[in-house]
């Protein structure tokens, strides 16, 4: 059985005194020999880390002792090797860059749909009010190429900062439909859903926990291919197993 535990987690929450927090996170994660990346900003935290299960648990216990992060939810997957070469803890202006300061997820979340409910909507073709469901992929084009939901809308953006302009260009096509924004782990689709709601798009949801949580709870119903990840695994299949070689061949 693979011995390396990989976690992905984020939370939009007001954080201050970032240099001190960075030093503390770097010290605690380094002390238990974790590898990966942690991003800190005034709007929250975003992390991807790998290590042994007991070390991951030790670090999460320490992190959640901070009342601001007590409910931090992590998504887990396994691998044979550590997919990161070093530990990096960075301070950023945003934990996911959008360049729209008015969008502040730390002040309130967009409505979310659970993986189980979404799987039911996709199977029946409409939401619980009978509206057509549009799956909107908020990821970069090269990520989408590794796999996405069947029939998903893909605006072929090259970076997330292009998403707002794409919304303005395609907003009319979303009228009268339930729009579910999705991404790898939830962070981009959370900002995306808020931006669309601010832009006048009605009936917008984010997929709670992103593709990774959807894989974990539904086995990937209605999803074609694999989920691209930004580490040496390259992609995960619906069983959350590394599928890097398969994904590379599929997108070559």
Curated annotation (Swiss-Prot):
Pfam families of this UniProt entry? Answer: Rhodanese, UPF0176_N
EC code? 1.14.-.-
The species this protein was found in: Bordetella petrii (strain ATCC BAA-461 / DSM 12804 / CCUG 43448)
Name the Gene Ontology molecular function terms of this record: oxidoreductase activity, acting on paired donors, with incorporation or reduction of molecular oxygen
- Catalyses which reaction(s): uridine(34) in tRNA + AH2 + O2 = 5-hydroxyuridine(34) in tRNA + A + H2O
PANTHER family assigned: RHODANESE-LIKE DOMAIN-CONTAINING PROTEIN 7-RELATED, THIOSULFATE SULFURTRANSFERASE/RHODANESE-LIKE DOMAIN-CONTAINING PROTEIN 2
Q: Which residues form the active site?
A: 183 (cysteine persulfide intermediate)
Q: Which domain of life is it from?
A: Bacteria
> Under what name is this protein listed?
tRNA uridine(34) hydroxylase
Gene name, per UniProt, is trhO
Give a yes or no for keyword Protease in this entry: no
* UniProt domain Rhodanese: residue ranges: 129-223
Q: Which InterPro entries match?
A: Rhodanese-like_dom, Rhodanese-like_dom_sf, TrhO, TRHO_N
Query: Sorted alphabetically, which SUPFAM superfamilies does this protein's record hold?
Result: Rhodanese/Cell cycle control phosphatase
């Amino acid at each position: 059985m693979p011995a390396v535990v990989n976690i992905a987690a984020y939370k939009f929450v007001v954080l201050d005194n970032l240099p001190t927090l960075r030093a503390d996170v770097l010290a605690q994660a380094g002390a238990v020999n974790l590898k990966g990346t942690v991003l800190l900003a005034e709007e929250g935290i975003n992390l991807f880390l790998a290590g042994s299960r007991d070390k991951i648990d030790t670090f999460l216990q320490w992190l959640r002792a901070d009342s601001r992060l007590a409910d931090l939810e992590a998504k887990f997957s396994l691998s044979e090797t550590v997919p990161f070469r070093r530990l990096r803890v960075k301070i950023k202006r945003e934990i996911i860059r959008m360049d729209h300061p008015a969008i502040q997820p730390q002040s309130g979340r967009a409505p979310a749909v659970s993986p189980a409910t979404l799987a039911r909507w996709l199977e029946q073709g409409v939401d619980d009010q009978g509206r057509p469901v549009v799956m909107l992929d908020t990821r970069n084009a090269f990520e989408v190429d590794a796999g996405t939901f069947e029939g998903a809308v893909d605006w072929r953006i090259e970076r997330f900062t292009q998403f707002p302009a794409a919304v303005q260009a395609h907003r009319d096509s979303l009228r009268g439909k339930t729009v579910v924004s999705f991404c790898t782990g939830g962070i981009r689709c959370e900002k995306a859903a808020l931006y669309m709601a601010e832009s006048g798009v009605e009936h917008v949801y984010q997929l709670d926990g992103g593709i990774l949580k959807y894989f974990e709870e539904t086995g990937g119903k209605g999803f074609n291919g694999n989920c691209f990840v930004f580490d040496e695994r390259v992609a995960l299949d619906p069983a959350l197993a590394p599928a890097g070689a398969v994904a590379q061949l599929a997108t070559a």
